[in-house]
Amino acid sequence: MNKITLSLLIGGALVFGACDDDTAFVGMDIMPEGDNVTAHSKVYNLQTTTVKMDSVLANTSTCYLGSIVDPEMRVRTTSDFLAQFHLPQNFKLPDADKMVKNEAGNIAADSCDIRLYFEDYYGDSLATMKLSVQALSKDKPIDENLLYYTNIKPNDFVDKSSPYNKSVSYAVKDLSRPDKETSGSKYYRQVVVKLDKEFGTQLMKAYYEHPEYFKNSHQFIRNVCPGFYFESAGGVGSLLTTSLIGMNVYFRYHTVNEAGRDTIVDGMQRFGATEEVLQCNRVANDYPGSIDVDQLDNLTSTYLKTPSGLFTEMTIPVSEIVAGEHYADSINQAKITIRKYNNQTNSDYALPTPEYLLMVRKDEMGQFFEKKKLPNSSDSYLSSQFSSVANAYQFSNVAQLITNLKIERDLGAGIEKGDSEATRNAKYQAWELKNPNWNKVMLIPVAVKHTTTTNYYGQIAECSSPTWTYVSSY
C-alpha cells in the first residue's frame, strides 16, 4: 500500500445551556467570555492501491482511433469505435423529378464518403495506420436504451455480408499535400474513406420509396443506415481524437437560375455522428513487457492511466479520525494533496498528464458516469487543475464526505447514544465485513467541460482522453 496524506482542521464545541426569565442575558449564559470552541489540526495517512479497470462507459461524443505504446509503462493501447449517424432536422432532398438520373434513367448518387475530422492526436504524425470501416447490421443495431462499455464486442454488431466495407491507410500528416497547406490552425486534419457510390444511391432510393424511414434518426438507423464500425486494423504509433464525423452523399439536380434558365447544380447531404445518436469507443490495453499489474502494490506510487486502464483506489481513515475523544468532533476542513512523480522516461511521445482528477465513492463510480452526474462535493469531488508548479492535485475540502461516511457507518451498524467505544468498535467490525467498500474512493482522470448560464455554473466530467501519471503524497 502507498501513502497519501489527509490534513484535517477539527473543531470540538462545548455546548452550554441556561434557563433565566430575563432573555436579555441568554446569549451571555450560553457563550460566556469566549466561544468555548477548541480547534486543532491533524494529518492522517491514506492507503492507496492501483486498480486495473477492464472497461469504462463507452457511450460518448468523443471517439478515439489508433494504437500507441506508452513509453513510460510500455502498455499498448488500441482504440476504435462504432458510430451512428443523425438525421438532420427537417431533412429533405430535392424532388425526384429534379434529380439527375444515370444512363438507365434511375436516381443515382455521384459519390459517397465518410470524413473523420480531428485536431488532437498522440504519437508520431508520420506513422502509417490502417483503418477498416464496416457497416453495422440492421438486425442488431446499437440500442439507445442500453449502456455500453469499452470492452464492447463490435463484431456482434457488424454486417459481415455488406458490400460497402472499406479499408484505407492514413497518417496524421498528409504527405500528399504541401507543408504550407497542412500546417497552421486553418488546416483541418481529416481521414477520408470513399464508399461505393452505390451506398449513396441506395440511401437516396430509400428516401423516395420510403419517406417514413426519414422522419427521425430512430427510423433512419433501423431501416436505412445503422452506422459503421471504425476499426483500428493495423499500425502502431498514433491515436487521434475525432472532433467531427460526417457521412456525405453527393448528387446533382436541376434548378432554375436567376435568369430563369434550367441549370444543373451540385448537391451534398451530410449526416453527422453527433450527440443525438450513439458513438461507442472500444479500448484494449495490452501489457506485454509492461509492469505486472499484480506487482503494482509493491511500488512506492499508484498509477492512473486512461482510457480505462489503471485507476487509484484510496481508503479514507474514518476510524482513526473519529477514534476516542474525537468521536463527537466536527470536521471543518479536510484537504487532500496528491503529488505527481516526474516521468522516468524521456520521450517525444509521452502521454500528457491529466488535467483533473475525479474522486468518487467506489461503489458509486459506475452510476456517476451512467447517470451523467456532476461532482456534488458530498460523495464526489473534482480536484483543482493540475499545477505544474506544485506538481500536484488538490481536493480543497472533503469534510462533508468524511462526515457522511461516519454517519452512514453509525446508522448501518446500529450505534446508540450510550454505546462505549468498545461496543461501537464491535458493531463497526461486523458491519464493515458486509460493506468492505464503505470508505473507499476512486481517483479517475477526467476531461472537464465548463458550462455557464445566467443562473447556473456547472462542471461536466467524463473519462479522460489518453493520459497517464503516477502519484505519491506529501
Predicted regions and their residues:
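Secreted, disulfide-rich extracellular signaling modules
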Residues: 2-12, 16-474
